[in-house]
Amino acid sequence: MTETAYGNAQDLLVELTADIVAAYVSNHVVPVTELPGLISDVHTALSGTSAPASVAVNVEKQKPAVSVRKSVQDDHIVCLECGGSFKSLKRHLTTHHSMTPEEYREKWDLPVDYPMVAPAYAEARSRLAKEMGLGQRRKANR
């Protein structure tokens, strides 16, 4: 490591130490006498870490739980991540896989119009909305 790179690394280490200690002290009660020890401990811990060596890792693409063709059934949709069956996939993706529908479609190379709701469920909700009169203009009150 060159001297300037080493100096920059040391500056970064001191800056990170200061940020971590400041964040800790702002949320915890620390006696003034223990502050130097805390700073030293954090600095030592950070000094012990190093940048990971670049290792060529052969990462296999994750395989879907079921085939994309079989994932959409009339009464349910199968999650390609875990294999679970759902009427609506959006909430499951958000809560269990921390993914948006767009990220899910991108990960599995799905078309933009890939459904997030089972076809029968969508039809039932549509029918219910029409029966309730949703989507129609209100009658003028005179």
Swiss-Prot record:
Transmembrane segments: none
Keywords: DNA-binding, Metal-binding, Repressor, Transcription, Transcription regulation, Zinc, Zinc-finger
GO MF entries: DNA binding; zinc ion binding
Keyword Zinc-finger set for record: yes
GO BP terms: regulation of DNA-templated transcription
Gene3D superfamilies: ROS/MUCR transcriptional regulator protein
Matching InterPro entries: ROS/MUCR_sf, ROS_MUCR
Domain of life: Bacteria
Entries under Pfam families matching the protein: ROS_MUCR (PF05443)
Positions of C2H3-type zinc fingers: 79-97
Function statement: Specifically represses the virC and virD operons in the virulence region of the Ti plasmid.
Family: Belongs to the ros/MucR family.
Protein name as it appears in the record: Transcriptional regulatory protein ros
Gene name for this UniProt entry: ros
